[in-house]
Amino acid sequence: MLQMGKAREPNFLILFFFGLILAFGISSEGSQIRHYKWEVEYMFWAPDCNENIVMGINGQFPGPTIRANAGDTVVVELINKLHTEGVVIHWHGILQRGTPWADGTASISQCAINPGETFFYNFTVDNPGTFFYHGHLGMQRSAGLYGSLIVDPPQGKKEPFHYDGEINLLLSDWWHQSIHKQEVGLSSKPIRWIGEPQTILLNGRGQFDCSIAAKYDSNLEPCKLKGSEPCAPYIFHVMPKKTYRIRIASTTALAALNFAIGNHPLLVVEADGNYVQPFYTSDIDIYSGESYSVLITTDQNPSENYWVSVGTRGRHPNTPPGLTLLNYLPNSVSKLPTSPPPETPAWDDFDRSKNFTYRITAAMGSPKPPVKSNRRIFLLNTQNVINGYVKWAINDVSLALPPTPYLGAMKFNLLHAFDQNPPPEVFPEDYDIDTPPTNEKTKIGNGVYQFKIGEIVDVILQNANMMKENLSEIHPWHLHGHDFWVLGYGDGKFTAEEESSLNLKNPPLRNTVVIFPYGWTAIRFVADNPGVWAFHCHIEPHLHMGMGVVFAEGVEKVGRIPTKALACGGTAKSLINNP
């Protein structure tokens, strides 16, 4: 059995790479169709011991976990039981090859599902990995519309690493203020910012105004929990001398997080559904939209329990860490660890954050990127003011989605459904990223970056100063419909001299990537998936304020689109004329 000790690390790597080679030889035989019937509705819940309204599925929060094997077809019958709101669900990390209408992005891939209506999502899960799903209309993710989506290897195949058990962890942040009040505040003049979350939730559970670790700090109020409450910690039950895989996904609306387990090193083996070169770390930073798998070995004192701690990074930590226990059975969960929880690194220690992120490279045998690209787009994200409203913009364009979904508008050639002028592909060379923007040319827009099928595209994400002096924030960017190679990161403005530093040897494949303050991030992808795809900051209020773009490729090759997906806006009339 695999041990976590350093002396066994080389043997583990050999097994890992051997297994990886076997994994790439998988077939699609024996795939299944997995059916789910979901009702989405608001309900009373107490995620952090304070009763509130959450958006749940079938009376559950978080929503039910989808578990399938690679090659399986997933069919979700989604019934909207919200009384006054539409709804969609995005299957984060699922590529939707052949089913771009099922991507679950309102105004891009489909119409919102109206109250009382039913919509069938039908798609194939291609690759094994750790994924999740969430609402993609307004700020419904912040309201609790999310859940886990786990894809195992095809039937009869195994992962390229051994483990004895598995723990699934979905991380989120929680506000006591309703999403409707948050949305109105973000769209007000002057803006009313949402503030930091009240609580970090681990599998939908957290504690507000009390701490399960109060015995180490007299300033904290101890939690008085029986264990059956919806806010009681989700305990990680483990047996001694075993290896466990912990799947970690972050569906936070705002918070960047740090995950650590007391006395237990983490072996990182997967990121965003792709295998990575394994490496040990004491903790991981995880940004909204990212997912990881880590292996731990329960080789510590078996008579003790150990802290699991999730703290905030990248923003001033006004939110207490989320806590739970790694419970070595048969110990009682009431037995607290002898030491306090791991201390979260300083929120503004970006060098530490970069050190972790830069260590992530592709596992041996992973697909390599094309040597050269056909097209390069530079995207500068800035915070701006438009007619007195605070917005986020990309190359001076703040995204406002049209009422007719792009997929249908382009499929039926509806030229007036959105701006036919493509957005800028570059920003001024003399732009000073170290000073606040001037806001002179910023506008609202909904144009599309269109690619030829097979085109190899580089995107350089460029960060800059916000409206307040000496302030730049972390932004995690998520691309729908594709995985991309992360070619590199850097400080300051990207220049031609940076070209030689790009990693073409073993860049990791991801679907979400971070851009650090005052820095740049370079990615490469192949436009080989016909459809229309969002590319946006995964921080919920930033997208709400316009921080995103739209990519399209080969829409003419998209097959039949279900009528209900396009029964709104200009496409509704087109469906009548072109049944």
UniProtKB/Swiss-Prot annotation:
What pairs make up the disulfide bonds?
Answer: 49-231, 111-568, 210-223
| GO annotation, cellular component aspect | extracellular region; plasmodesma
Supply the alphabetized keyword list. Copper, Disulfide bond, Glycoprotein, Metal-binding, Oxidoreductase, Repeat, Secreted, Signal
**EC numbers:** 1.10.3.3
Q: Which reaction does it catalyse?
A: 4 L-ascorbate + O2 = 4 monodehydro-L-ascorbate radical + 2 H2O
Q: Which cofactor does it need?
A: Cu cation
Q: Where does Cu cation 1 bind?
A: 90, 478
Provide the cofactor note recorded for this chain's UniProt entry.
Answer: Binds 4 Cu cations per monomer.
Record: residues binding Cu cation 4? 475, 537, 542, 547
Catalytic EC class: oxidoreductase
Glycosylated residues are: 122, 355, 470
Q: Name one Pfam family in it.
A: Cu-oxidase
Q: Which InterPro entries does the entry link to? A: Cu-oxidase-like_N, Cu-oxidase_2nd, Cu-oxidase_C, Cu-oxidase_fam, Cu_oxidase_CS, Cu_oxidase_Cu_BS, Cupredoxin, CuRO_1_AAO
Positions bound to Cu cation 3: 136, 480, 536
Localization: Secreted
Record GO terms (molecular function): copper ion binding; L-ascorbate oxidase activity
What does UniProt give as the signal peptide span? 1-30
| Role | May be involved in a redox system involving ascorbic acid.
Membership in a protein family: Belongs to the multicopper oxidase family.
Query: What name has this protein been given in UniProt?
Result: L-ascorbate oxidase
Q: Which organism is it from?
A: Cucurbita maxima
Q: What is the lineage of its organism?
A: Eukaryota, Viridiplantae, Streptophyta, Embryophyta, Tracheophyta
Q: Which gene encodes it?
A: AAO
